[in-house]
Regions:
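Long, low-complexity, charge-biased intrinsically disordered regions
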Residues: 1-189
């Protein structure tokens, strides 16, 4: 589906990929400050490239300028896309689908008001919040007691190639600074 050729009520869902709401980020930062939770940030390396197309799905794209565009039979040549790629209208949506399925498989519950927020209460009654963003930086921020952090990071690295960026300092272009028991948010460019 080409983004500019979508039809209302028919194929809008094939390319749309939402992101974490800024109000959710503010709520989670306030919760972390009040409860003394840790906030971590992960960057998924080449996030969209770590996904697969749906079974039976075939996507083709035109050749880049400068390549022979006609085959010997006179028909236009196209490339068949084997995995989602950046710039592909469906890429972010495919990544989102896989990430959500994986997160729910860990036992986290998806929030009703923001698709990018998940929560879980562990066996020892520790509350785990996971907030994700599938923007160009494709990062996830985890807020939980320290012992949950190691387990969650282990599960993440088992499934995805990622970098642990430590304490979250910026998400959705919002600066996040912890000062003792408070967390300050500021708009950063």
């Amino acid at each position: 589906v080409v983004g500019c050729a979508q039809r209302p009520g028919i194929d809008f869902d094939q390319t749309h990929c939402s992101t974490l709401k800024s109000t959710s980020l503010r709520f989670l930062a306030a919760t972390a400050a009040i409860q003394g939770l840790h906030m971590r940030r992960y960057d998924f390396v080449s996030a969209i490239l770590q996904d697969d197309l749906e079974p039976g799905e075939q996507i083709v794209c035109r050749l880049l300028p400068g390549h022979e565009t006609l085959g010997q039979d006179g028909n236009n040549k196209v490339w068949r896309v084997l995995i989602p790629i950046y710039g592909m209208q469906q890429g972010g949506r495919r990544w989102q689908r896989s990430l959500f399925l994986w997160t729910r498989s860990l036992g986290l519950t998806q929030c009703d008001t923001d698709n990018y927020v998940f929560s879980m209460t562990t066996a020892d009654d520790a509350l785990v919040w996971v907030a994700m963003s599938t923007t160009s930086s494709s990062s996830t921020s985890k807020m939980a007691p320290t012992h949950c952090y190691a387990s969650f990071t282990r599960e993440l690295t088992r499934r995805w190639e990622l970098e642990d960026e430590g304490e979250v300092a910026n998400l959705l272009n919002i600066g996040i600074a912890r000062q003792g028991t408070s967390i300050k948010l500021n708009q950063s460019a």
